[in-house]
């Protein structure tokens, strides 16, 4: 089975295409953009725009559609930052193609950007290093938030199953027990 055939089995092919386009677009533009033009500022701006689009898309669309997770950050009345995690219904079907691509790219992209940071440091390309630090911070933030969100969702599912089981047994014992 070819890669294209596997990707076409996605539950959300449009979300998958945009997820891959933004994520890989930023990487390829950074690595190969200067082969097509010598304008570093143009490449810098283009990569930052692709990174911002990728960050927003992963955070708000791709994560929700592909793996049923979403996160955001709120400021409380006291001014402290609060992370909020949202998970889809545990009964919802998560397509294995969507899930594998999402998690591999979510964790793979920061690793690639860190490798590019080391390379930029070794080549003394400090302006490129600034761009790579922006990329690392955005991709690591999404990876960290989705890792927490996934753990939060799994913990809630376990608590829900345990409490649901206890509640159903308690209900059977009190209400149904009277009629039997």
UniProtKB/Swiss-Prot annotation:
It is found in: Golgi apparatus membrane. The keyword Transmembrane helix applies. It comes from the Eukaryota. One of its GO terms (biological process) is vesicle-mediated transport. The keyword Transmembrane applies. Its main location: Golgi. Pfam families: DUF846. The chain crosses the membrane at residues 13-35, 40-58, 101-121, 126-146. GO terms for cellular component: Golgi membrane. Keywords: Golgi apparatus, Membrane, Transmembrane, Transmembrane helix. It is a multi-pass membrane protein. Belongs to the TVP23 family. Golgi membrane protein involved in vesicular trafficking. This is Golgi apparatus membrane protein TVP23. It comes from Yarrowia lipolytica (strain CLIB 122 / E 150) (Yeast). The gene is TVP23.
């Amino acid at each position: 089975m070819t890669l294209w055939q596997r990707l076409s089995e996605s539950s959300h092919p449009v979300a998958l295409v945009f997820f891959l386009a933004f994520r890989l677009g930023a990487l390829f533009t950074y690595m190969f953009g200067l082969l097509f033009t010598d304008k570093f500022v143009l490449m810098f701006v283009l990569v930052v725009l692709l990174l911002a689009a990728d960050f927003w898309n992963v955070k708000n669309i791709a994560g929700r559609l592909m793996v049923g997770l979403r996160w955001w950050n709120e400021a409380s009345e006291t001014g402290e930052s609060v992370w909020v995690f949202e998970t889809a219904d545990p009964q919802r079907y998560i397509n294995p193609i969507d899930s594998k691509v999402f998690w591999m790219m979510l964790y793979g992209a920061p690793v690639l950007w860190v490798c590019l940071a080391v390379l930029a440091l070794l080549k003394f390309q400090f302006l490129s290093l600034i761009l790579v630090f922006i990329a690392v911070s955005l991709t690591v933030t999404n990876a960290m938030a989705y890792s927490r969100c996934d753990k939060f969702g799994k913990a809630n599912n376990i608590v829900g199953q345990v409490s649901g089981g206890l509640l159903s047994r308690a209900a059977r014992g009190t209400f149904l027990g009277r009629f039997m």
